[in-house]
């Protein structure tokens, strides 16, 4: 991991904490846990154009773990999206462009409105399925064309994994083998009420493998190089994927 990556990840952590501190509320845990993952995604992996945030064939990023929003807003700002420092520091304020629960295109770069635990999982599956469907329409004219090649990424947390709505969406993605769909899981083993083991005992690696997912687990969620390798391997798998951090 080179020095510039380390500095960028640390700056992202500090900025997301500043946003939370100014608001007087927010979830710093996931912002610390997933800073390197968020940075790696934007700096090394994503096909996006900050100056044209609605470019149709862009990769999608869905925040099912909506409490990651301070980190995401900080990343949009650092990546050059049309979001200024003043708007960042208005996080969670009435009529601000940086609401606590992400809202579609507010600010630019937010691909879906999310908030309810597990709700973003179905949105992500829908985005990936829509890509397949639109390509099928194009291929009626020329079967060799594969014009839409975007990948949908979805950040999830323990609460998303315990949601009934997400269970149906995950199952559907596996049965339909929806590729170009990658879930990035902050597996910190904690809930708002205490340790995850008090309420949730499932072996998620085996469970998702049985659903037909490609599954990977990284012990070091701060290593940008290893994170990038894991994401690229998931993209090559030709399956829906889950990466645990």
Residue ranges and their predicted role:
Residues 1-153:
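Thiamine diphosphate
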Residues 50, 106-245:
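Glycine-rich ThDP/TPP pyrophosphate-binding loop and its adjacent helix/strand module
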